[in-house]
Amino acid sequence: MAVLTALGVGVLVGVVVGALGAGGGILSVPALIYLLGQDPHDASAGSLVVVGLTAIVSLIAPARAGRVHWRDGATFGLMSVLGALVGSRASVAVDGTVLLALFCVMLAVVGVVMLLRGLRSRRGADDGEGSGTGGASERRGLLVVAAAATFTGFLTGFFGVGGGFIVVPMLVLALGFPMKEASGTSLLVMIVASSAGLAARVGTHSNVDWPVVLAFAAASMVGGILGGPLTKRASASTLTTAFGILLLGVCAMTAYNLLAA
């Protein structure tokens, strides 16, 4: 039964990742905890497997469409590794309830920022804001990129969510990428950061339920293929607004379950 549930939820998670370039961990962590009964630390470790594999498949569509900044994405991803290693080690030392509460707070903050940005864009911002062509790192400065990447990596490792929901806002707000290009490039960063975060959990008390997690990941990869083309059909402002609403919705659900526990 758990494997069947994982297959169903995995497809939905994959569609979100493919369409938005983010959101896999946001959905897989609560799903593994509340639908499949896993411990928060185990769920966060398992979600890194799901997000990393899903991101690999989901990267195909934006790469073909030219919406991936390979140099900036690879640089950002490599710079996030140290933060991911430190964050993963810090995470296992925190109580599961505290981990979820902090996760909820971060979802609220990022969700509000992205929702407001999407609404402002709808009121007249240019859909192509931030050309994203060559050298975003150079335009903003190496220190800003390094700080954003390290911070992203730490939060990725700490919460075990792959980092897409942090990477997309960072690429948009710190590096000036358009939303569609940030979504595509974030998948590359997610692959690097989730791999580093998972490696850092080796030897800790986090356990991955491999049959469930691999079923979840396989279904999510299928969903990622289905979700990729959706990016072409939606405006940048719509994607940004939908992303913010998604984060706030998951935040509300997590807060409700924490208070009801």
Can you describe what each PLM-predicted range is?
Residues V29, L53-I56, V112, V168, ...:
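Alpha-helical transmembrane segments of polytopic integral membrane proteins
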Residues A19, F154, F158, I191-A199:
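Hydrophobic alpha-helical segments of membrane proteins
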Residues V17-I26, T156-G163, E181:
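Short helix-coil transition sites and intra-membrane helix breaks within transmembrane domains
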Residues S47-V51, S186-M190, V212-V213, A217:
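Short hydrophobic/aromatic, small-residue-rich stretches within specific transmembrane helices
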